[in-house]
């Protein structure tokens, strides 16, 4: 390969230096006009990894791939009626409050049950609640909360109930073609950048509708147009499967239902993973149940016949007794939970190893305390029993 003439190399270097200077001048001008951080090289970003907040369900965190809901993104949860959509969202609210954050609930359906929310772990005294009169009002309230930067999670329940003002003021039977879709499209354009900037998680619950005249393919669709589908980083399809029967006196009573949550869209991890959870009536997602199942599959909790054991210690005969043990021993629950998350790469293994190291450090201290030599005072009286 022929070398470039020396003169041509000098011209190339000079031209490259001029381009670099022009680029730096443009970057400085952009930052001056729009603020620091408005443009930067990707490698200069302080945080490359997407920050997440746990969904409140171990199985769902694993299915999401990143360990929870990504911060600064839009999440859509949809499914049939009574499938558990609001329950999944309320667990996210409880988790946000548990981590010290502030959560808001835009109840467009006017159907939130405070007692049920409290049973799921939501601090209803600290929960911000709005029951808007129209779709525009609900989205404006959500926008102001997000723009404040003080709210960590905003839940809108539901998109289908965000009725445009023109439809409310009109008569029943009036045609309002595409009105709600235009409202949602405008809201997504307006809220998208603000959500990302403030690192707020915005969860939109949606219902299902069926397209008329569809002979082939899936006739199901979600109301509110296509904007939400495009702007959402994660979309969850929630479906109730089989009913769960009780035990003992309640063996003929339905005490919950097995629910399948499918990640149909995921921009931060591989999509199409599924989580199967048990939603118990009046309690929400059974955290002990999902941990017991996943830990047993990973052989962290051993199962022999009907008995479950952890670290060679039996924790219960039958799944119900094992769940009860985990509920009564939160330190064991947290220890197993960390091991499971470490196995799936949701947390660094250092946390688990540090805990094991601390436990090992404590063991010799206990032995030293037991084997510690006590100096003998010759003035003491000793009683010696001699066996005949």
Swiss-Prot record:
Name the UniProt record assigns to this protein: Protein RecA
Phenotype of gene-disrupted mutants: Loss of DNA transformation; incoming DNA is very rapidly degraded.
| Assembly with partners or alone | Interacts with DprA; probably forms mixed DprA-RecA-ssDNA filaments.
Q: Which GO terms describe its cellular component?
A: cytoplasm
Q: Does the keyword Chloroplast apply?
A: no
Which PROSITE patterns has this protein been placed in?
RECA_1, RECA_2, RECA_3
Q: Locate the compositionally biased regions of type Basic and acidic residues.
A: 357-369
Q: Which organism's genome codes for this protein? A: Streptococcus pneumoniae (strain ATCC BAA-255 / R6)
Q: Name one Pfam family in it.
A: RecA
> Is Hydrolase one of the keywords?
no
Q: Which Gene3D superfamilies would you find in this protein's record? A: P-loop containing nucleotide triphosphate hydrolases
Residues that, per the record, bind ATP: 79-86
């Amino acid at each position: 390969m022929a070398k470039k003439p020396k003169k041509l190399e000098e011209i190339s270097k000079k031209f490259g230096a001029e381009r670099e200077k022009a680029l730096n001048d443009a970057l400085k001008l952009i930052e001056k006009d729009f603020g620091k951080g408005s443009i930067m090289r990707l490698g200069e970003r302080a945080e490359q990894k997407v920050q997440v907040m746990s969904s409140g369900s171990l199985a769902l965190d694993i299915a999401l791939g990143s360990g929870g809901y990504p911060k600064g993104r839009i999440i859509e949860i949809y499914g049939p009626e009574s499938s558990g959509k609001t329950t999944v969202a309320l667990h996210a609210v409880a988790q946000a409050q548990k981590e010290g954050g502030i959560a808001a609930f835009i109840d467009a359906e006017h159907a939130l049950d405070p007692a049920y929310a409290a049973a799921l772990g939501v601090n209803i005294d600290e929960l911000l609640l709005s029951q808007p009169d129209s779709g525009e009002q609900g989205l404006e309230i959500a926008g102001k909360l997000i723009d404040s930067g003080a709210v960590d999670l905003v839940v809108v329940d539901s998109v289908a109930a965000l009725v445009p003002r023109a439809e409310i003021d009109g008569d029943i039977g009036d045609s309002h073609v595409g009105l709600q879709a235009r409202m949602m499209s405008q809201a997504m354009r307006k809220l998208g950048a603000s959500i990302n900037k403030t690192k707020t998680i915005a969860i939109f619950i949606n219902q299902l509708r069926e397209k008329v005249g569809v002979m082939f393919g899936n006739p199901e669709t979600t109301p509110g147009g296509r904007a939400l589908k495009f702007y959402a980083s994660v979309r969850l399809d929630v479906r109730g499967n089989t009913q769960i029967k009780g035990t003992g006196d309640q063996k003929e009573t339905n005490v919950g239902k097995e629910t399948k949550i499918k990640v149909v869209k995921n921009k931060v991890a591989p999509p199409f993973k599924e989580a199967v959870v048990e939603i118990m009536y009046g309690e929400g997602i059974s955290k002990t149940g999902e941990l017991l199942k996943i830990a047993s599959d990973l052989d962290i909790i051993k199962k022999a016949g009907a008995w479950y054991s952890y670290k060679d210690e039996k924790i219960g005969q039958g799944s119900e007794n094992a769940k009860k043990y985990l509920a009564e021993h939160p330190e064991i629950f947290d220890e197993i939970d960390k091991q499971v998350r470490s196995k799936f790469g949701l947390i660094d293994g250092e946390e688990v190893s540090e805990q094991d190291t601390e436990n090992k450090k404590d063991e010799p201290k206990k032995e030293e305390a037991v084997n510690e030599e006590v100096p003998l005072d010759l003035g003491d009286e000793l009683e010696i029993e001699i066996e005949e």
